[in-house]
A protein has these predicted regions:
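Conserved ABC ATPase "signature" region
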Residues: 1-15
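Conserved ABC ATPase signature
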Residues: 19-23
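ABC ATPase nucleotide-binding domain "signature motif"
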Residues: 24-30
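Hydrophobic anchor residue at the start of the ABC signature
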Residues: 33
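Catalytic Walker B motif of ABC-type/P-loop ATPase nucleotide-binding domains
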Residues: 44-48
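Helix N-cap at the start of a conserved alpha-helix in ABC-type nucleotide-binding domains
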Residues: 55-57
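Conserved beta-strand-loop-alpha-helix hinge in the C-terminal portion
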Residues: 101-114
């Protein structure tokens, strides 16, 4: 059921049997995210997970990550790297790096982009 849920949430329902080489760049990105979310790991690292996605897919993927990391039945922590300020609203905490060093750690509502 988790597989079906995650595939639906990232917009990949119906693509289960398609060969990967036939998928578009955005579809491959969504499939990669789905695989990470389904993996039963306690921690996942996502580097620019919405980079190749359209606006609708970006929102769905980020909401799915938020939902799965908020599920108290199976703890999942996700660290995602982004340059998109609007994605911060999905985070529980924001760490800002400057020149390779941690310069701040705070709640998303208190973060100010410089």
């Amino acid at each position: 059921k988790k597989i079906e849920y995650v595939l639906d949430q990232v917009g990949m329902t119906g693509f289960e049997k398609r060969p990967v080489h036939t998928l578009s760049g955005g579809q491959k990105q969504r499939l990669t995210i789905a695989c990470a979310l389904i993996s039963n790991k306690n921690f996942i690292l996502l580097d620019e997970p919405t980079a190749l996605l359209d606006q609708t897919s970006q929102s769905k993927v980020l909401q799915t990550i938020k939902n799965l990391t908020s599920d108290n039945k199976k703890p999942l922590s996700a660290l995602w790297i982004t340059h998109r300020y609007e994605e911060l609203t999905y985070a529980d905490a924001v760490a800002e790096l400057k020149n390779g060093f941690l310069s701040s750690w705070q709640e998303p509502s208190k973060f100010q982009y410089n």
